[in-house]
Every structure is written in C-alpha cells, then in structure tokens.
C-alpha cells in the first residue's frame, strides 16, 4: 500500500508542477511580448516561480522515500 501511495504522490506532484510551469512560462512570454523592456525583470521573476513550483515534486519524492522506508 505504501508503494502505491508513494507513486500517486509523485505522479500528482509532477502533474501539478508541469501544469504550473507551463502557466508560468506562457504568462512570462505574454508579458515580454507586451513589454519587451521589462524582459529582465520578468525572466528573473519567472525563474523564481519555476524554482518554487519545482520544489513540490522534490518534496513529494522525499516523502515517498520516507513512506517506503517504514
């Protein structure tokens, strides 16, 4: 049962991160298209957002290993 829970947790976290990253990048591209002079600031904010979104699957993998280790 623990293996199934770990697989579901990792899968859902990866799905959410993929959707989140897609939204972040698409909105950044839209912003750069509207205001090219704000490119640097938008890219910096995008990278911070992507890093925060990617932390969720990493935490899910750690929790999955903890569940399997019991």
From Swiss-Prot:
One of its GO terms (molecular function) is lipid binding. It holds the Pfam family ATP-synt_C. It is found in: Cell membrane. The chain crosses the membrane at residues 5-25, 47-67. Keywords: ATP synthesis, Cell membrane, CF(0), Hydrogen ion transport, Ion transport, Lipid-binding, Membrane, Transmembrane, Transmembrane helix, Transport. The record marks 54 as: Reversibly protonated during proton transport. It comes from the Bacteria. It is a multi-pass membrane protein. The keyword tRNA processing does not apply. The keyword Ion transport applies. GO terms for cellular component: plasma membrane; proton-transporting ATP synthase complex; proton-transporting two-sector ATPase complex, proton-transporting domain. F(1)F(0) ATP synthase produces ATP from ADP in the presence of a proton or sodium gradient. F-type ATPases consist of two structural domains, F(1) containing the extramembraneous catalytic core and F(0) containing the membrane proton channel, linked together by a central stalk and a peripheral stalk. During catalysis, ATP synthesis in the catalytic domain of F(1) is coupled via a rotary mechanism of the central stalk subunits to proton translocation. Key component of the F(0) channel; it plays a direct role in translocation across the membrane. A homomeric c-ring of between 10-14 subunits forms the central stalk rotor element with the F(1) delta and epsilon subunits. PANTHER family: ATP SYNTHASE LIPID-BINDING PROTEIN, MITOCHONDRIAL (PTHR10031), ATPASE PROTEIN 9 (PTHR10031:SF0). F-type ATPases have 2 components, F(1) - the catalytic core - and F(0) - the membrane proton channel. F(1) has five subunits: alpha(3), beta(3), gamma(1), delta(1), epsilon(1). F(0) has three main subunits: a(1), b(2) and c(10-14). The alpha and beta chains form an alternating ring which encloses part of the gamma chain. F(1) is attached to F(0) by a central stalk formed by the gamma and epsilon chains, while a peripheral stalk is formed by the delta and b chains. NCBIfam families: ATP_synt_c, PRK06876.1. Belongs to the ATPase C chain family. This is ATP synthase subunit c.
């Amino acid at each position: 049962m623990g293996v199934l829970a770990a697989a579901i947790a990792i899968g859902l976290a990866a799905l959410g991160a993929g959707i989140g990253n897609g939204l972040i990048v698409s909105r950044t591209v839209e912003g750069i298209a509207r205001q090219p002079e704000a490119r640097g600031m938008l890219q910096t904010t995008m990278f911070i957002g992507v890093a925060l979104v990617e932390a969720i699957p990493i935490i899910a993998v750690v929790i999955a290993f903890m569940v399997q280790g019991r």
